[in-house]
């Protein structure tokens, strides 16, 4: 009996030892799946009140679909009431598998949430706002010229981040997206990565872009169509110029192309477009190369001036937006003239003239502003964006546009860069027209931080 007891105790001890020595199997946490989509951008290439084009790089997975609606269901794709498959793809172009999905029949001045679902996953939820079909105040940002490396890349990123903080209705990017001739795949991928990551607001709002062709896209003059699905004219894919309308008859923007024939078909198209929209309150033209650069390192664009400037006067263009020179400038209202008192084909005319605004330096190294004219209101050498506030007529104020120049980076004499904006408090959907603290304006007197169209002289 005693022997059996000892055996049972021994067996029990062995069992306890073995049980204690067994290590429970621990399942490591699953790594989040790598995203199947990247490089999102929203493009306005049609009626911005009812359409928008969602563009992205499909990294892997099949059968992607954009699910969207006016209520936020986060990533519960099946709850969104609308869905749309890609309407176009450009597989392999610039090393990407770009998909375009055009959303139509949207309601004006509304928020829409969207996600992309494919065979392998669900993307992040983002949102956008359509433009109003009636005259309502809005803001937009304009600028151009970025580079793909060094301090110029850093400066461009500072400008990108300002977009997210100021929440404009849209951005006009006025050409020269990358270094080189626009054919380098890695540079485009970098630009698109930065655009998505830095111009999206902290609550997921994406800002539509209105792309314009610049000389650094001349290696392939179809590139903006193949990466942004922008329109072209006369069945010629290189003839990238188009126009958009905002707020009923409040605001019309014309995206021209200074890198293809400015006369001929483009001039005819421009005159027809201006004629059809001549009764709009504001008409704005954007194009990469300015007529009269404000730096001696850039040549005059006389043929372009001859083709377009007379039409701008004839149809009373409000503002002309140029880039290319890598510096900042704003003119008084000017019109084409060879009369006494004119200079380089322009004369100041506060009643019928156009205010010309520019000239690039979103990120590219600033050039000296060493070619001012008698009709130059202000110029400067720094990285910058232009922030426009557009207001329709009210009971107590006529329609007007306020133009702000925001400095995003400067360089000292040793080429050391200082960027601005990290301490700027982001705007919200409730205060889109407020001026946030710590915004670094270019504000020489007597006009200070704001230049207004129609122009108002300040003493």
Question: Which functions belong to the PLM regions below?
Answer:
Residues 72-98, 139-157, 181, 225-234, ...:
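Acidic/histidine-rich helix-loop elements
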Residues 100-102, 111-127, 185-279, 307, ...:
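Extended active-site neighborhood of metal-dependent phosphoesterases/phosphodiesterases
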Residues 1-5:
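Positively charged n-region of N-terminal signal peptides that target proteins for export
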Residues 9-16:
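Bacterial N-terminal signal peptides
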Residues 145, 175-176, 214-215, 256, ...:
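Active-site glycine-centered loops adjacent to acidic/histidine catalytic or metal-binding residues
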Residues 16-142, 395-459:
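Acidic, histidine-bearing metal-coordination/catalytic regions of metal-dependent phosphoesterases
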């Amino acid at each position: 009996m005693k022997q059996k007891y000892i055996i049972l105790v021994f067996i029990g001890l062995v069992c306890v030892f073995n049980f204690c020595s067994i290590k429970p199997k621990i399942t490591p946490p699953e790594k989040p799946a790598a995203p199947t989509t990247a490089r999102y951008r929203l493009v306005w290439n049609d009626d911005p009140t009812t359409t928008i084009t969602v563009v992205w790089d499909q990294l892997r997975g099949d059968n992607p679909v954009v699910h969207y609606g006016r209520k936020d269901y986060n990533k519960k794709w099946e709850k969104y009431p609308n869905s749309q498959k890609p309407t176009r793809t450009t597989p392999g172009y610039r090393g990407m598998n770009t998909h375009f999905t055009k959303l139509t029949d949207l309601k004006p001045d509304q928020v829409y949430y969207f996600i992309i679902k494919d065979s392998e996953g669900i993307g992040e939820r983002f949102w956008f706002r359509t433009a109003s079909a009636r005259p309502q105040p809005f803001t937009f940002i304009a600028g151009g010229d970025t580079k793909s490396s060094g301090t110029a890349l850093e400066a461009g990123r500072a400008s990108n981040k300002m977009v997210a903080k100021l929440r404009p209705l849209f951005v006009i990017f006025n050409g020269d997206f990358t270094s080189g001739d626009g054919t380098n795949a890695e540079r485009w991928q970098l630009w698109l990565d930065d655009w998505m990551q830095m111009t999206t607001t902290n609550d997921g709002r994406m800002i539509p872009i209105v792309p314009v062709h610049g000389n650094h896209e001349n290696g392939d003059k179809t590139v903006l169509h193949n990466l942004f699905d922008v329109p072209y004219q006369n069945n010629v894919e290189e003839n990238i110029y188009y126009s958009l309308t905002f707020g009923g008859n409040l605001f019309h923007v014309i995206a021209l192309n200074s890198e293809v024939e400015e006369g001929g078909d483009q001039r005819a198209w421009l005159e027809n477009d201006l004629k059809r929209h001549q009764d709009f309150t504001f008409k704005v033209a954007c194009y990469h190369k300015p007529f009269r650069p404000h730096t001696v390192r850039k040549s005059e664009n006389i043929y372009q001036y001859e083709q377009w400037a007379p039409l701008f006067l004839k149809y009373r263009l409000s503002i002309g937006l140029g880039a290319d020179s890598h510096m900042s400038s704003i003119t008084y209202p000017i019109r084409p003239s060879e009369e006494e008192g004119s200079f380089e084909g322009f004369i100041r005319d506060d009643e019928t003239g156009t205010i010309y605004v520019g000239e690039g330096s979103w990120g590219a190294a600033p050039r000296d502003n060493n070619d001012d004219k008698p009709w130059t209101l202000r110029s400067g050498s720094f990285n910058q964006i232009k922030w426009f506030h557009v207001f329709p007529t009210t009971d107590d104020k006529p329609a007007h546009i306020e133009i702000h120049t925001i400095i995003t980076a400067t360089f000292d004499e040793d080429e050391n860069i200082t960027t601005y904006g990290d301490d700027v408090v982001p705007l919200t959907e409730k205060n889109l027209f407020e001026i946030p603290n710590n915004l670094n304006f270019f504000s020489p007197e007597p006009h200070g931080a704001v230049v207004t169209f129609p122009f108002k002289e300040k003493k």
